[in-house]
């Protein structure tokens, strides 16, 4: 497996008095600003999650380096009596509003306990910012208005984690990828299925999309295709030994049956991965206008050796490339962002990922040409 050279690599969150998990990254292109979020935990376990932290990075397009500011706690992203988990940033380019979605889980009640008892103590929340994350609104609990009575049909649920999506349609629709463990008849355990929360009015109201087939958990979405052929692509964690993908022809409301993506391997219990769409940088006559990039551990036995994969035909699950290695050792969750053109003229990406056995969360920056030089050499 080839190793990818990088433009920059820097540890942003380091375990000490606190642990850090679940990275989320968003790039605000006009401001040339990166916002890196993570859960700050009392220990590494889910039950000891507490609040979110944020580091703000200023990207210098001349030096191709990011200067990071000190860590700050996002105190507004907190629902009393609950712990904040799964940060999901979303930027509405039309209203210039930054959303931070997350789940709030009561006390120290674990996901396992909710699955065993069928008692859902998880809430859907968000905060917003109109100054690119410098100040934030008070928290809003969207559970009753968005999920309603369906909440009691789920043993628990989650969002993302990681970046969300604004569609290129007229409404500028907003999508928050999510998953829920739906309760089954008494002899069956709750089963996970992915879906999206949708807004067609810039976040004033939200609705539930319909579920993808079972065996789909933590997920991310991207928009691929052109014109009337645009579809929402969903890539999800599974326990099937490989990722699953599904596509929606109607802005994330309905998804066709999922497909197993055998080239994107999963460890036995699965792991979160990140997917992002970006404009096709080549001039090939038969090239589609959007490609996909994906990051995830490359080992089918355990969470180790973070790789990046490329798909030049996004809807075909058989056309994913072999991975290029981004980081060695125990690596887990990651989040990708497209940062425009890099110094070599090819698309540039930022990646925030868990490293060193969950001891640190690292930011690295690389170009498509660094990761997949053969793509450009073949032109």
Curated annotation (Swiss-Prot):
Gene3D superfamilies: 2.120.10.10
InterPro entries recorded: Sialidase (IPR011040), Sialidase_fam (IPR026856), Sialidase_sf (IPR036278)
Positions annotated as BNR repeat: 127-138, 197-208
Annotated compartments: Cytoplasm
Name this protein carries in UniProt: Sialidase-2
Annotated TM spans: none
Organism: Cricetulus griseus
Superkingdom field: Eukaryota
Positions contributing to substrate binding: 21, 41, 179, 181, 218, 237, 303
Broad class of where this protein is predominantly found: cytoplasm
Active site: 46, 333, 354
Motif extent (FRIP motif): 20-23
Family label: Belongs to the glycosyl hydrolase 33 family.
CDD domains reported for this sequence: Sialidase_non-viral (cd15482)
Keywords, alphabetical: Carbohydrate metabolism, Cytoplasm, Glycosidase, Hydrolase, Lipid degradation, Lipid metabolism, Repeat
Catalytic activity: Hydrolysis of alpha-(2->3)-, alpha-(2->6)-, alpha-(2->8)- glycosidic linkages of terminal sialic acid residues in oligosaccharides, glycoproteins, glycolipids, colominic acid and synthetic substrates
Species lineage: Eukaryota, Metazoa, Chordata, Craniata, Vertebrata
Function, as annotated: Catalyzes the removal of sialic acid (N-acetylneuraminic acid) moieties from glycoproteins, oligosaccharides and gangliosides.
Protein's GO biological process: ganglioside catabolic process; oligosaccharide catabolic process
One MF annotation (Gene Ontology) recorded for this entry: exo-alpha-sialidase activity
């Amino acid at each position: 497996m080839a190793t990818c050279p990088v433009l920059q690599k820097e540890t942003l969150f380091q375990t000490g008095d606190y642990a850090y998990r679940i990275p989320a990254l968003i790039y605000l292109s006009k401001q040339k600003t990166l916002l890196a979020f993570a859960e700050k935990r009392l220990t590494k376990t889910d039950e000891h999650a507490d609040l979110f932290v944020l580091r703000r990075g200023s990207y210098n397009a001349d030096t191709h380096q990011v200067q990071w500011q000190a860590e700050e706690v996002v105190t507004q992203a907190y629902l009393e009596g609950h712990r904040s988990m799964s940060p999901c940033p979303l930027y509405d380019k039309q209203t210039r509003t930054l959303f931070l979605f997350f789940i709030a889980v009561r006390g120290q009640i674990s996901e396992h306990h909710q699955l065993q008892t069928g008692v859902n103590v998880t809430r859907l929340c968000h905060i917003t910012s109109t100054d690119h994350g410098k100040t934030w609104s008070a928290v809003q609990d969207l559970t009753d208005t968005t999920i309603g009575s369906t909440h009691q049909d789920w043993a628990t649920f989650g969002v993302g984690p990681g970046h969300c999506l604004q569609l290129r349609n007229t409404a500028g629709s907003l999508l928050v990828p999510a998953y829920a463990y739906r309760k089954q008849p008494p002899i069956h355990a709750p089963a996970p299925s992915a879906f999206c929360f949708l807004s067609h009015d810039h976040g004033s109201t939200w609705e539930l999309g319909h579920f993808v087939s079972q065996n789909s958990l933590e997920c991310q979405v991207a928009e691929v295709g052109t014109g009337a052929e645009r579809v929402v692509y969903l890539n999800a964690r599974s326990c099937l030994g490989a990722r699953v993908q599904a596509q929606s022809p109607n802005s994330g409301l309905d998804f066709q049956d999922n497909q197993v993506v055998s080239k994107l391997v999963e460890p036995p219990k699965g792991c979160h991965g990140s997917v992002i769409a970006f404009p096709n940088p080549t001039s090939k006559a038969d090239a589609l206008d959007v490609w996909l990039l994906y990051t995830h551990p490359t080992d089918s036995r355990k969470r180790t050796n973070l790789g990046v994969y490329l798909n030049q035909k996004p809807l075909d699950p058989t056309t994913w490339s072999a991975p290029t290695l981004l980081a060695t050792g125990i690596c887990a969750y990651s989040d990708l962002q497209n940062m425009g053109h890099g110094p070599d003229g090819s698309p540039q990406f930022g990646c925030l990922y868990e490293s060193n056995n969950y001891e640190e969360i690292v930011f690295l920056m690389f170009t498509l040409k660094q990761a997949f030089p053969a793509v450009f050499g073949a032109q």
